[in-house]
C-alpha cells in the first residue's frame, strides 16, 4: 500500500467520523446537558465571571491541615492552561478555513456549538474535579480518571488515555509547530530548520519544569496575547463600522442557506462551523478536564463554571474576532485560505498604509500555538501517568514530544492531520459516552452548590454529600 492510497483511506474514515458521527453526537450531548443542567451556561454566567475574578488564589479549604500542599495550581492557572490549549491555530487559521469552505454562515454554527456545548464543558470539568487524585506535586484528573473511578472500566479509561496522548501530545503538536514554521518563514524569512530547532529546545526547557512551570507560563502569556488580539479586532471593526450590519446579515443568511452566492451551503456551513468550533473550544472533547482537575478549589462546580467561561472566551471572543477581521475586510472570496487569509484580512482591514497583518499574525501564531504545544504536552503527561506512573516513561515522552515538534515543523502533515481527526473523533466519543452516564453527579453537585449559594455560603463540598460515590472521591473527604 502506497502513501497516496493510505491518505485516501484515512481521509474517507476521518470524513465519516468527523462530518457525521461526531457532529451528530456533539449536538445531541450539548442539547442534553443544557436541558439537565437547566441552561447552566446562561443562568449562572454572572457566577462564572465572579469566580474568574477571584480565581487567582489557591483554594485549599478542602485539604486537611496535616496533608501536604497538593493542588498548588490556582483556579486561574488551570483556566489559563485550558485556554492555552484551546487558543491556537484553530482560532486564526481554522476560522479562516471554515469561512473559506463553509461560507460566513460557518461562524453562526460555531457560535451555536459553543453556546450549547458549554454545558458539556461544565459537566466534564466538574467530573474531573470530583474524581481527581493526588499526584506528587499537584492534583491530576480527567476522563481517564473519572471513567475508571466512576464507571470502573479500566480498559475504557486506558483507551481514552492512549487516544488523547496520540492526538494532543503528538498529532496536534506537530500541526502547531508546522503552522509556526510557516508563519515565521512567510513573514520574516526564517529558515524552517532554524524554527524547528528553536521550538524543539524551547519546548524541552518549558515542559521539563513540570506542571507548575507550564501553568505559570500559560498564566502570563495567554491573557496578554488574547487581549492584544481582541483589541486589534476591535480597531478593525471600528475602522470598518459601516460594514458591521452587512457582516451580521451575511453570517445569518448564509447559515441557513438564504444567500448561497456567498459560498457554501447550509450543510457545509453547519459541518465546518461545528468541526472548527470543536477543534477550537474543545467542549465535550475530553481534553479540558485534564487542566480543570489540577485546580485547588473548595467545590468541583467552581472549576466547572470557570471552564464553561473558557468556551465562551475561546469562541465568542477569539474566534469571533478572527471572523469579523476577515468578513469586514471583504476579501474572504479572493481564493486565500487558512492563516494567509487572516494575514491578508488584517492588512486590508487596517489599510495598506499601516499594514502589518503578516507580522502581527506571525507573532500571535507563535505565542498561541506554542502555548498550545505546552498545554497539549501536559494532557499527554497526565494520561501517561494514569497508564503507568513512571518518571522514566515521562522523560521518554518529553523527548518524543520535542522530536515531534521538530518533525512537525519540517514535514508535510496531510497524513498526520487525517490520523489526528480519527483519534480526536474516537476520544470525543469515548468521553461523551462516559459523561452521558456520569453526568448525574455533576447535576447533584450543581444543586448542592446553588443551595449553599442561596444560604449565603461560599460553597464547600465534602464526599459525604454523595454517599454512593464517596469511596472514589479521595480528594474530598
Please place each PLM-identified region on the residue numbering.
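N-terminal alpha-helical transmembrane segments of multi-pass membrane transport
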Residues: 1-84, 89, 100-105, 406, ...
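Transmembrane helix-loop junctions in multi-pass membrane proteins
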Residues: 2-6, 36-41, 90-95, 104, ...
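Extracellular loop-to-transmembrane helix junctions
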Residues: 15-54, 100-137, 313-321, 422-432
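Transmembrane alpha-helical segments of multi-pass small-molecule transport proteins
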Residues: 23-28, 156-165, 186-211, 228-229, ...
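Membrane-interface loop-to-helix entry segments
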Residues: 25-32, 37-49, 53, 178-184, ...
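Helix-loop-helix module between adjacent transmembrane segments
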Residues: 33-34, 113-137, 143-207, 363-373
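Alpha-helical membrane segments and immediately flanking helix-loop junctions
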Residues: 61-99, 127-130, 136-144, 148, ...
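Extracellular/periplasmic helix-exit of transmembrane alpha-helices
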Residues: 122-131, 136, 232-250, 264, ...
Amino acid at each position: 500500500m502506497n502513501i497516496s492510497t493510505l491518505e485516501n483511506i484515512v481521509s474517507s474514515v476521518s470524513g465519516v467520523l468527523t462530518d457525521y458521527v461526531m457532529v451528530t453526537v456533539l449536538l445531541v450531548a450539548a442539547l442534553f446537558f443544557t436541558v439537565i443542567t437547566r441552561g447552566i451556561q446562561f443562568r449562572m454566567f454572572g457566577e462564572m465571571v465572579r469566580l474568574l475574578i477571584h480565581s487567582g488564589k489557591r483554594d485549599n479549604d478542602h485539604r486537611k491541615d496535616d496533608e501536604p500542599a497538593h493542588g498548588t495550581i490556582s483556579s486561574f492557572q488551570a483556566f489559563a492552561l485550558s485556554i492555552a490549549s484551546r487558543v491556537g491555530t484553530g482560532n486564526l487559521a481554522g476560522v479562516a478555513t471554515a469561512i473559506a469552505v463553509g461560507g460566513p454562515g460557518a461562524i453562526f454554527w460555531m457560535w451555536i456549538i459553543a453556546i450549547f456545548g458549554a454545558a458539556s464543558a461544565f459537566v466534564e470539568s466538574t467530573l474531573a474535579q470530583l474524581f481527581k487524585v493526588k499526584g506528587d506535586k499537584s492534583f491530576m484528573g480527567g476522563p481517564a480518571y473519572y471513567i475508571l473511578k466512576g464507571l470502573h472500566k479500566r480498559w475504557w479509561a486506558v483507551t481514552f488515555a492512549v487516544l488523547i496522548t496520540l492526538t494532543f501530545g503528538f498529532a496536534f503538536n506537530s500541526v502547531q509547530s508546522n503552522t509556526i514554521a510557516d508563519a515565521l518563514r512567510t513573514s520574516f524569512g526564517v529558515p524552517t530548520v532554524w524554527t524547528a530547532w528553536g521550538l524543539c529546545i524551547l519546548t524541552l526547557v518549558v515542559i521539563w519544569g513540570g506542571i507548575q512551570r507550564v501553568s505559570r507560563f500559560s498564566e502570563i502569556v495567554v491573557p496578554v496575547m488574547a487581549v492584544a488580539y481582541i483589541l486589534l479586532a476591535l480597531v478593525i471593526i471600528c475602522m470598518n463600522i459601516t460594514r458591521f450590519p452587512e457582516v451580521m446579515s451575511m453570517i445569518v443568511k448564509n447559515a441557513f442557506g438564504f444567500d448561497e452566492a456567498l459560498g457554501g451551503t447550509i450543510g457545509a456551513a453547519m459541518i465546518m462551523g461545528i468541526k472548527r468550533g470543536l477543534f477550537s473550544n474543545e467542549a465535550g472533547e475530553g481534553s479540558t478536564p485534564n487542566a480543570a482537575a489540577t485546580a485547588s478549589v473548595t467545590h468541583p462546580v467552581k472549576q466547572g463554571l470557570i471552564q464553561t467561561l473558557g468556551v465562551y472566551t475561546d469562541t465568542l471572543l477569539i474566534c469571533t474576532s478572527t471572523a469579523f477581521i476577515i468578513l469586514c475586510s471583504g476579501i474572504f472570496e479572493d481564493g486565500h485560505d487558512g492563516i494567509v487569509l487572516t494575514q491578508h484580512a488584517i492588512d486590508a482591514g487596517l489599510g495598506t498604509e499601516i499594514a502589518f497583518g503578516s507580522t502581527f499574525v506571525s507573532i500571535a501564531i507563535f505565542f498561541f500555538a506554542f502555548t498550545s504545544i505546552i498545554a497539549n504536552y501536559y494532557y499527554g503527561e497526565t494520561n501517561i501517568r494514569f497508564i503507568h506512573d513512571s518518571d522514566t516513561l515521562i522523560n521518554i515522552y518529553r523527548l518524543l514530544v520535542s522530536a515531534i515538534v521538530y518533525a512537525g515543523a519540517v514535514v508535510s502533515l496531510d497524513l498526520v492531520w487525517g490520523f489526528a481527526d480519527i483519534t480526536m473523533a474516537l476520544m470525543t466519543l469515548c468521553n461523551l459516552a462516559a459523561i452521558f452516564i456520569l453526568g448525574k453527579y455533576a447535576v447533584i453537585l450543581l444543586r448542592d452548590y446553588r443551595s449553599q449559594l442561596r444560604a449565603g455560603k461560599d460553597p464547600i463540598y465534602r464526599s459525604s454529600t454523595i454517599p454512593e460515590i464517596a469511596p472514589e472521591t479521595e480528594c474530598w473527604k
